[in-house]
């Protein structure tokens, strides 16, 4: 790995490298911005090809979490953690307990939980070493599976798109192309079928597709499976990416026949400039870090004490935030990416006048779990 310089982390407050030879833990924790409160972000476990690749990922993701926290109006800043390893064979309870010790050493400047390659059960182990864990199973005081709330937030985003483009938030008989049927994507596709929409789907797992096709018989909507490559070119109203990031790029934009892009995947645009490219093609883009903020809202809300009704109320407000950004972009003749980023930066600047970063010596008033 090349030497880490301050230039690489110039936008971040703190980057922590975690190494425990006894358990094999190699992890990086990045804290981007704590203006709003302590950093919050999931921990993913992936077999990165190099430490450099892991660092690039955690820096990018932690910055995205700052924007997501601001847009979701939660009292947290942006952070992220990555564990270098194959989740299929490198996981042990001891590894996650070691990770929990490193989180504890930050003394409340960073809260974490599940992400790609990790599960709530993994963080039950980390919770034995630190209280700064969110997204725990219900039996441990958490709100349970956050994918339910994330999918609910995506549905609110799709309704906001529909209202802005077609003057109604009713999704019946609209056509959607859902890419990825993971924990969130499956629930979104099922929700659309319940609404009476027509849904194209693709996923790497044929069994998951078959499961959705079987469920579709119960609902008024219709589902049709297509290949991973064909999903970009189907005749749909909205493209709904719910898998990997970077899938909106020069090549795929040319193939899209939709009026909007709105989905759960993180970092959907390969580059920010692709927001302008979508705008030039009259394709409305719903910024992903707002659309998929339901899960964040749920796990952050745990610190007030679990309350599912309150979580749904907060998540429902994503509709209004997105609609405001759509209107702002139209009025200013800018892309929705630019409008959303302006929205976030303005809110951060207002809060920065009150406090510039979070210190555990001045704990937030909402902290109820110690």
From Swiss-Prot:
Pfam families for this protein: ELFV_dehydrog, ELFV_dehydrog_N
Pathway as given in its UniProt record: Amino-acid biosynthesis; L-phenylalanine biosynthesis; L-phenylalanine from phenylpyruvate (PDH route): step 1/1
Annotated L-phenylalanine binding sites: 68, 114-115, 266
Keywords: NAD, Nucleotide-binding, Oxidoreductase
Recorded GO MF terms: nucleotide binding; phenylalanine dehydrogenase activity
PROSITE patterns in alphabetical order: GLFV_DEHYDROGENASE
One BP annotation, GO: L-phenylalanine biosynthetic process
Signal peptide as annotated in the record: none
Biotechnology comment: This enzyme has been engineered to lead to an amine dehydrogenase able to catalyze the direct asymmetric reductive amination of ketones using ammonia as the sole amino donor. This reaction is a highly desirable transformation for the synthesis of chiral amine intermediates, particularly for the pharmaceuticals industry.
Entry EC no(s): 1.4.1.20
Binding site for NAD(+): 44, 115, 146, 150, 180-186, 203-204, 243-244, 264-266
Activity as a function of temperature: Thermostable. Has a melting point (Tm) of 85.5 degrees Celsius.
Active-site feature positions: 80
Catalysed conversion reaction: L-phenylalanine + NAD(+) + H2O = 3-phenylpyruvate + NH4(+) + NADH + H(+)
The keyword Ligase is assigned to this record: no
Function: Catalyzes the reversible NAD(+)-dependent oxidative deamination of L-phenylalanine to phenylpyruvate.
Record-stated family: Belongs to the Glu/Leu/Phe/Val dehydrogenases family.
UniProt name for this protein: Phenylalanine dehydrogenase
